[in-house]
């Protein structure tokens, strides 16, 4: 019997409205390709991180035409960013719809390695927090796309630049908030987002650099706003200036822009300003002098890298090199950079240090244990082939348990908590074993759960050898084994069969009080996991079975026992040979000469000799298929039924 669960999550459609069936069907096709629910959560979390990196690209859309002294926009960047943003938002909308009609009822466990899902829209809608739903909706609203595609081409586009900045900021915060539940789900299922310590450190460093890039993008757009403010202030100081906000657009700009704006806003460092009429650009002077505001659309990588470097440099320096003007907004922006740099740097160092320590603690323990094992093997002069097998087993056990001693951990728990934990880990698997499925008493199964112990075997390992005593009964949960016999068991040499999930090795422990001798050799073909029951555990189970359960266990034992199957095959073959023998004897009787025939003595002797010779030839021709009594193999002895010892007082 196979104990492995279904590859995909189980979907229960009870209680779902008919209108949701089509949506659910499409979602099942999308999610059907995912290995587990946890992998899907990781994918959605990665999409959220990518969305955080895409949104600041909207701030790089405005440009300054240095030849005509007017504002323009990067149309190529508009198309690319809108397409990517729409694709990611659509992906997340599918995720929102899916979780609105699904509810996770069984988180990932170390025993099952699976998550189960039940489709139940009403239950989920009642339990889902309204706050998270509102945050999800605000996060995926296509407001930036609407602004850059509709408002910017209009005449009031300079006003829409400030609107765009606040829209990006208002959606950026909900996008960060919506990542927290996903992050908690992933860490609860996997223990960490990244399994490798270097991947975890790189992830924390990436998040630190992401904030640097975000601050650089806001600095870029604020520099353009500062330039626009300077031109408008210069026009306000001149009586003959009649430029309006719309005249600063390149599609409406004329020759007056070039003549007036060419000398209206000189780029002077804040420390060198001596005249009060000179405009103070503050910390945005670097963006204006570097020319990143005036580059052509095809030079976008240059603009992006420079703004990223500015943000990384000032966050790392906590904003100490920033020289601001007396503008309140600029000073507030500098304060945010300083405080954010301090917090981000502290979080980065703390997370990296914590992640490396948590990841290396068990690795160090494994290395220390490996060194002790090597010293012991060298001290005891263990042969090289045994050393290699020991090393491979230690590595395999580490991969499966991550250094956690499961049995020691379970023994340290209180009795009620230990029983509940073991019942959750083992009960479903034990119920699928035919030998244990006959137990109707729930407490007896729970007692068996408390007694089983998990074991691991490498490939090509011997579970038990022929002629050796059987000391434990193995219940296979994963892997394949081969059971062979070198003796003439049941009249056949090298009798072989395969064992897999749900099969049992060592069922002879049910017979008698002494340890039985194994009649077969069991060897693993692949890496095998399972549970073992010791002889005392078998006696405990047998002593608590009633008469009907014992009879049912005997029938189940006959059905699944290899000895009983082999004996049944030989018994059927012997019965068939006996049937063929009787049929042949009847044919011979029909060929005899009828009595009462009048023949003389010579003819009688001649006929008798002829019939005797013909019968001898007939026996010789049919010897291979008729199975004569002398050539027929003996029927093996019937295997013994299970013997149950009486319960000890």
Curated annotation (Swiss-Prot):
Gene3D superfamilies: 1.10.287.70, Helix hairpin bin, Jelly Rolls
Amino acid composition bias (Basic and acidic residues), ranges on this chain: 638-649
Region (Calmodulin-binding): 545-560
Chain ranges of the IQ domain: 565-594
GO molecular function annotations of the record: calmodulin binding; cAMP binding; cGMP binding; monoatomic cation channel activity
Swiss-Prot/TrEMBL keywords: Calmodulin-binding, cAMP, cAMP-binding, Cell membrane, cGMP, cGMP-binding, Ion channel, Ion transport, Ligand-gated ion channel, Membrane, Nucleotide-binding, Transmembrane, Transmembrane helix, Transport
Predominant location: membrane
Topological region Cytoplasmic: 1-43, 98-128, 184-200, 351-649
Short name of any one Pfam family annotated for the protein: Ion_trans
Keyword Cell membrane: yes
Region described as Disordered: 618-649
PANTHER family tied to this protein: CYCLIC NUCLEOTIDE-GATED ION CHANNEL 12-RELATED (PTHR45651:SF33), CYCLIC NUCLEOTIDE-GATED ION CHANNEL 15-RELATED-RELATED (PTHR45651)
Domain note: The binding of calmodulin to the C-terminus might interfere with cyclic nucleotide binding and thus channel activation.
Name by which UniProt lists this protein: Probable cyclic nucleotide-gated ion channel 12
Native organism: Arabidopsis thaliana (Mouse-ear cress)
The encoding gene: CNGC12
């Amino acid at each position: 019997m196979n104990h492995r669960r279904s590859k995909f999550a189980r979907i229960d459609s009870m209680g779902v409205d008919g209108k949701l069936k089509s949506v659910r069907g499409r979602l099942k096709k999308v999610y059907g390709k995912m290995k587990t629910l946890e992998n899907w959560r990781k994918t959605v979390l990665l999409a959220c991180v990518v969305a955080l990196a895409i949104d600041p690209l909207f701030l790089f859309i405005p440009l300054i035409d240095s030849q005509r002294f007017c504002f323009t926009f990067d149309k190529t960047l508009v198309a690319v960013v809108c397409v990517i943003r729409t694709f990611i938002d659509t992906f997340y909308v599918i995720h929102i719809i899916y979780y609105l009609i699904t509810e996770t009822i069984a988180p990932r466990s170390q025993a099952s390695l699976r998550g189960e899902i039940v489709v139940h829209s009403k239950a989920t809608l009642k339990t889902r927090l309204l706050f998270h739903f509102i945050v999800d909706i605000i996060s995926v609203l296509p407001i930036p796309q609407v602004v850059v595609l509709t408002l910017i081409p209009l005449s009031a586009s300079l006003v829409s630049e400030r609107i765009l900045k606040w829209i990006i900021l208002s959606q950026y915060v909900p996008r960060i908030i919506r990542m927290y539940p996903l992050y908690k789900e992933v860490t609860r299922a996997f223990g960490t987002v990244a399994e490798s310590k270097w991947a975890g450190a790189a992830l924390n460093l990436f998040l630190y650099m992401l904030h640097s890039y975000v601050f650089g993008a806001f600095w870029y757009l604020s520099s353009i706003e500062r330039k626009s403010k300077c031109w408008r202030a210069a026009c306000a100081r001149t009586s003959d200036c009649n430029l309006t906000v719309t005249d600063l657009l390149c599609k409406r700009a004329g020759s007056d822009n070039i003549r007036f704006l060419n000398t209206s806003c000189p780029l002077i460092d804040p420390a060198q300003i001596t005249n009060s009429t000179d405009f103070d650009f503050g910390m945005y002077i670097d963006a204006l002098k570097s020319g990143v505001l005036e580059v052509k659309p095809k030079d976008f990588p240059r603009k992006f890298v420079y703004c990223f470097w500015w943000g990384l440099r000032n966050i790392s320096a906590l904003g100490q090199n920033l020289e601001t003007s007396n503008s309140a907004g600029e000073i507030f922006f500098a304060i945010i950079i300083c405080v954010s740099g301090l917090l981000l740097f502290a979080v980065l160092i703390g997370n990296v240090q914590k992640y490396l320590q948590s990841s290396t603690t068990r690795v160090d323990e494994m290395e220390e244990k490996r060194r002790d094992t090597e010293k012991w093997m060298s001290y005891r002069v263990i042969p090289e082939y045994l050393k290699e097998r020991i090393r491979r087993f230690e590595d395999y056990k580490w991969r499966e348990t991550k250094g956690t001693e499961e049995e020691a951990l379970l023994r340290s728990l209180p009795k009620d908590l230990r029983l509940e934990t073991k019942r959750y880990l083992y009960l479903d698997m034990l119920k699928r074993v035919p030998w244990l499925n006959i137990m109707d008493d729930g407490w007896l199964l729970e007692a068996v759960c408390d007694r089983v112990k998990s074991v691991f075997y490498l490939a090509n390992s011997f579970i038990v050898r022929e002629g050796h005593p059987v000391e434990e009964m193995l219940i296979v949960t994963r892997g394949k084994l081969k059971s062979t016999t070198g003796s003439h068991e049941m009249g056949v040499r090298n009798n072989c069969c395969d064992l897999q999930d749900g099969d049992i090795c060592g069922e002879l422990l049910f017979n008698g009080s002494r340890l039985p001798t194994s009649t077969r050799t069991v060897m693993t073909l692949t890496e095998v996991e399972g549970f073992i029951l010791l002889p005392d555990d078998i006696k405990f189970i047998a002593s608590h079975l009633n008469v009907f359960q014992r009879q049912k266990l005997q029938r189940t034992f006959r059905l699944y026992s290899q000895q009983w199957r082999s004996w049944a095959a030989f018994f059927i073959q012997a019965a068939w040979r006996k049937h063929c023998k009787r049929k042949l004897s009847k044919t011979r009787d029909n060929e005899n000469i009828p009595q009462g025939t009048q023949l003389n003595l010579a003819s009688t002797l001649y006929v008798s000799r002829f019939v005797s010779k013909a019968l001898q030839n007939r026996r010789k021709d049919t010897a291979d298929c008729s199975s004569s009594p002398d050539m027929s193999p003996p029927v093996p002895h019937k295997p013994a039924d299970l013997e149950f010892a009486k319960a000890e007082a």
